[in-house]
Amino acid sequence: LMGLDFYRQVMELVARHRRPGQVIEHTIQTNATLLDSAWAQFFAEHDFLVGVSIDGPARLHDVYRRDKGGKPSFDRVVRGVRVLQDHGVRWNALTTVNRANEEHGLEVYRFLRDELGAEYIQFIPVVERPAPGGIPVGVEVTDRCVRPGGYGAFLSEVFDEWVRRDVGRVYVQMFDTTLANYLNVPGSMCVHAQTCGTALALEHNGDLYSCDHFVEPDYLLGNITETPMLQ
């Protein structure tokens, strides 16, 4: 919810405090519904990689991707993607695999590749627990979660298409990281890494966790307002 002025100030702080030779990469995640030329110009100027949440064609995307008023968001998301493309901004499709699209893996992949022109794709399984008290606990999951067999079938459909024609042309995080591990090259996904905890999750209040999948009281490392991260 922060505006452009906030992010311009962040870029000034990065330039001021970056160590000599240090390389800093900028990424941001958005639903793209409010992106305009000003945002796109800013992202292009600072070489941001923009992750855009989109779950397939309209009939699949809009099952769960609706705004607070209950209106579908698909058309606004696609408009935002086109704005990014018009300004040459690198973008990444962040596609959740859920109960609505789990049986349509190939359709989703072809839509992202052929209609949106996505060259970077992440498939993210929706596995969420009810949180009546604010903290998700227990083993029950919500109705929109992908089923284990559905997730496997989804990835298998996509892989069969990808391995035949898109290796080296379309980056699918799950597949490329798996191939990297096979070749003894460190991958970017924590689930394929030897150890966990290389991607810290910092909450707005200063709470620090070793992974954004475990932002729960049992996994709290500390708070940076009380304890420096180096400790």
What role is predicted for each listed range?
Residues 63-75, 82-195, 201, 205, ...:
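Radical SAM enzyme [4Fe-4S]-AdoMet core and its adjacent flexible, acidic
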Residues 215-231:
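Flexible mid-to-C-terminal extensions adjoining Fe-S/redox cofactors in radical SAM and related proteins
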Residues 20, 24-27, 171, 198, ...:
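Short, surface-exposed helix-loop/turn micro-motifs enriched in polar/charged residues
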Residues 59, 91, 227:
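Glycine-centered loop/turn positions within well-structured domains
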Residues 54, 211-212:
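Active-site flanking residues adjacent to catalytic metal/cofactor-binding acidic residues
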Residues 1-50, 54-60, 67-79, 83, ...:
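Canonical radical SAM enzyme core domain
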